[in-house]
Every structure is written in C-alpha cells, then in structure tokens.
Amino acid sequence: MITAPLLTFVVSVLDRDVREEAKANTEQEVQTALDYIEQDLAQAIYVYDSTGINGSPQNNNPIKDQVEFPNRSPILVFWKRNFEENKIPPQGDPSRNCSEKDCDDTYVYSLVVYYHSTNNPNNIWSDAARIERLEIQDQIVNRFLPKDDDNYVIEPADKGFNSIPLDKNVDDNNNLGDLQQKMNQWTKDKDKDFDPPKVLIDYVGTVGTVVAGTVDCTNVSTSAQLVGTANSGFYTCADSSKTLAKVFIRGNSLARIQDNNRCTANSTYCPTGSVTVQGRSLFGSYN
C-alpha cells in the first residue's frame, strides 16, 4: 500500500530535479551568449536596423540577401573594426613575417551576422532553435609596400568579403548619400561563398513555440526598429543612427527534457535575458 505513493513521490522529485537542472543550464548558457554578444557588439562601427536587413521601398538591396543561408534568419548584423596585433612588418622590411617585438599593429573591418537558426544537419542539434554567428574579415596588408608587391597581402580576406562602399555614389546622379545609404549598398564577393556560420548557443525558442507578444523598441531609442519576431528565441531592437542594439534571447529548457516544448507566458523554464549595447568603434584608416 505504501509502495505506490512512495514511488510516485520519488518520480516526482526526480522529474523536478531534471527540470531544475535543465533550467539552470539554459539560464547559464543564455547569459554566456549575451556576454559574448555584448563584447562583440561593443566593437561595432555600424549596426543594421530592420530596413537595412530586410529591405524597404527605399532599400532594394537588403543585407539579408547578401548573407543568406537556408533555415536561418539574420537578426543582428553589424560592421566592426578589429584590432590586429603584431601583424605589419616595419617599414623597409619586405617580408610577410617579422618578430613580435618589431611588428606594428593594425585595424581591419569585418562584417558580423547573428542568425536565428533552425538548421539541423543530421539531427546533431536539438529540436529547438539556435543562434549562429558568421564573421568575415578583410585582408591584412603591408601598408608600406605597393599593392602589386608579392608580399603586400599578409593575410587574405575571408571568403565572400567585399570592402565597405564608403566612396561609392548611391545613385546614377553621383549623389554621395548618407552613411545608411552607403552601408545598404554592400554586396558580397559573388565569386566566393562564405564558410557556414557557427553555433553560439542551442536550445533557444523557435518562432512557432513561443508566446505571442509585442515589443516596444522606442524604449531603446525613438528610431530603433524590431528585427525578428517579438518574444521569439532571438530578436533585437536596432538603431543604425546610434550604432545601438538591444538583444533579447529566450532559452527553452523544456526542449532538453520533453517533446511538448512550447514556452507559455512567463514560464520559468524558458528563461529570458537581454543586453543593450552601443558600438564604441569609429570609422578610420586601416591597413
């Protein structure tokens, strides 16, 4: 008579322990991902808003078309200026390599894309969604050598990289345009495909398994725009004019332990986190 209730109690305790462990792991992973994105985004010189990512009547070259991968939606896209230490041989040294104490430092631009992804090759990931990251960086060159010198390029650009079109006119009337118009002109190197993005975090909410809702991006800034689906596993409020973004992540610990993994409103098993970051880098000379 005592065995059945006791067994039920033990199963209940074990189930609760499993849920709590899954929740704790998910909370930690969400915070770790936010910390990583915060450090990454702090180096930004330009952040794309929804108009830049998804297009508009005024922008017929959305950057999503340039950074497209199957089963992935770009949610956070920005340019940053990377510091490269001990890369450039001193003036008068024609080689590609030099000792660390003699090398000069330099900066190079790179494009960073964070995706909300349901891509799952060979079912190696969870049934939930993921956040994936792509970075493509410009070449590192020896600024002391002519461009036709064999040693001019120290490290080649990543596949698919094209320079930022800052000096390009935005229309056929030779109008220079503003910064947003210039950045919206960027196109990838069509002769070279990107390497695939890498997973930053698994077990985030998908669009179909989250509670519906709205997000007021004006709380971030008056001109911030929503990118992605509100209250999904990954979305942002981005303001290109201020190089500013608020990043939201909703984890899904239920996907670790059960098939029915829909996140209800305020579910403790679908922990959320956010971070607001303003890029601190500036455009400048590089290479």
Question: How would you name each of these model-derived features?
Answer:
Residues 11, 42, 46, 83, ...:
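Residue-level marker of positions within ordered structural domains that often coincide
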Residues 1-38, 42:
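Aliphatic-rich helix starts adjacent to a transmembrane/signal segment
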Residues 80-287:
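Intrinsically disordered, low-complexity regions enriched in Pro/Ser/Thr/Gly and acidic residues
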Residues 18-25, 55-64, 93-101:
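Short helix/strand-bridging catalytic loops that position acidic/His residues to coordinate divalent metals
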Residues 1-9, 61, 73-82:
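Long, hydrophobic/aromatic-enriched structural stretches that serve as scaffold segments
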Residues 21, 25, 29, 52, ...:
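A sequence-level detector of short, solvent-exposed, charge-rich linear segments
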Residues 43-78:
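Short, glycine/small-hydrophobic-rich surface segments
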